Amino acid sequence: MLNQIIINKLNDQINLEFYSSNVYLQMSAWCSKHGYEGAATFLLRHADEELEHMQKLFNYVSETSGMPILGKIDAPKHDYSSLREVFEITLEHEKLVTSKINELVEVTFESKDYSTFNFLQWYVAEQHEEEKLFSGIIDRFNLVGEDGKGLFFIDRELATLE
């Protein structure tokens, strides 16, 4: 059985994952509107992935006799100046999620809740992969630039990335 402090933190993370899905879904819509179909597809997949992260946390709280509580989810930003801005914001958002996961891991360790600590290790590894992925996308912008050909190349490659 989880203590209430950990339940509250897990619920905060559930809601952050839900918000993350909405952020990527909205970014996908912006990309689609501006002709970046590869980026739109990529971000749509990531929106679905964030929902899976949320559901995994939701189920864990339920399975451990806690009560998952869905809070108010703010509307994400919906207008961007460029495709690069979309992915710069995405990288910063993933860094925020990483910091929140790390805080949660720290609380579970200090509380000697080793079961939840162990459960969260999947998220620790996942966040490492997410930051690496989005840093790599920014590296592509730096490498090929943002002219028409560069954007075409990046958009086409995004369609193939997981």
From Swiss-Prot:
GO terms for biological process: intracellular iron ion homeostasis; iron ion transport. The keyword Cytoplasm applies. It catalyses: 4 Fe(2+) + O2 + 6 H2O = 4 iron(III) oxide-hydroxide + 12 H(+). Residues 1-145 form the Ferritin-like diiron domain. It is found in: Cytoplasm. Gene3D superfamilies: 1.20.1260.10. Its main location: cytoplasm. One of its GO terms (molecular function) is ferric iron binding. Its EC number is 1.16.3.2. Fe cation 1 binds at E17, E50, H53. It is an enzyme of class 1 (oxidoreductase). Keywords: Cytoplasm, Iron, Iron storage, Metal-binding, Oxidoreductase. It comes from the Bacteria. Fe cation 2 binds at E50, E94, Q127. InterPro entries: Ferritin (IPR001519), Ferritin-like (IPR012347), Ferritin-like_diiron (IPR009040), Ferritin-like_SF (IPR009078), Ferritin_DPS_dom (IPR008331), Ferritin_prok (IPR041719). It holds the Pfam family Ferritin. GO terms for cellular component: cytoplasm; cytosol. Homooligomer of 24 subunits that assemble into a spherical protein shell (12 +/- 1 nM diameter) that can sequester at least 2000 iron atoms. Iron-storage protein. Belongs to the ferritin family. Prokaryotic subfamily. This is Probable bacterial non-heme ferritin. The gene is ftnA.
